Design a protein with these regions (language model features):
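Histidine- and acidic-residue-rich, metal-dependent catalytic cores
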Residues: 1-171
Length: 171
């Protein structure tokens, strides 16, 4: 519980550095960006960290989240390309990736189902495998209000969740 507040602060401030860049980052594909735009975008964790450097009220855990939220387990992230970091950073990394996928920030927007599959395929490689399992169990694959097609090819709307994320209650 004592880690909850620093994680929340880090989660809220993790993309603060984006305000200091001009590179496009909404609903874009990395392949469409110029090398200079990618370079500039990859600076945002350092820019965010620098922006809060003198703020005494921000805990070190939160600072690390701001700096490391794009690092990955396999060392493929940025800006430092590290593969060893604390659990608080891994939590925000996973949440940030999911949010990016479904909101179209830093990548093309995809559905919740596609985002969950993408994260699942990266479990143990880019993201903490155990954490991915927990995360997926907490996220509704078909949120209330989602239009779905049943196995009998009938259309329906999700009205509630069940213990099985693949079988919500539909109307």
């Amino acid at each position: 519980e004592e880690l909850l507040l620093p994680i929340a602060i880090g989660g809220l401030l993790h993309d603060l550095g984006i305000r200091y860049i001009t590179a496009p980052y909404e609903d874009c594909n990395w392949d469409e960006l110029t090398p200079n735009e990618i370079f500039e975008f990859k600076k945002h964790p350092i820019l965010g960290y620098t922006a809060i450097e003198e703020e005494k009220w921000i805990p070190d855990v939160s600072r690390n989240i701001i700096l490391y939220h794009h690092e990955r387990m396999d060392g493929s992230g940025f800006p430092l390309k590290q593969n060893s970091f604390e659990v608080s950073c891994r939590i925000v990394q996973l949440c940030d990736a999911f949010d990016s996928y479904i909101s179209g920030v830093e990548c093309r927007r995809i559905s919740i189902q596609e985002a969950l599959e993408k994260i699942k395929s990266q479990a143990g490689i880019m993201f903490d495998g155990e954490m991915v399992g927990e995360f997926i169990s907490l996220i509704a694959k078909y949120p209330v209000g989602t239009t779905v097609k049943t196995s009998e090819e009938e259309n329906g709307v999700v009205i509630s969740q069940t213990d099985d994320p693949d079988h919500p209650i539909i109307m």
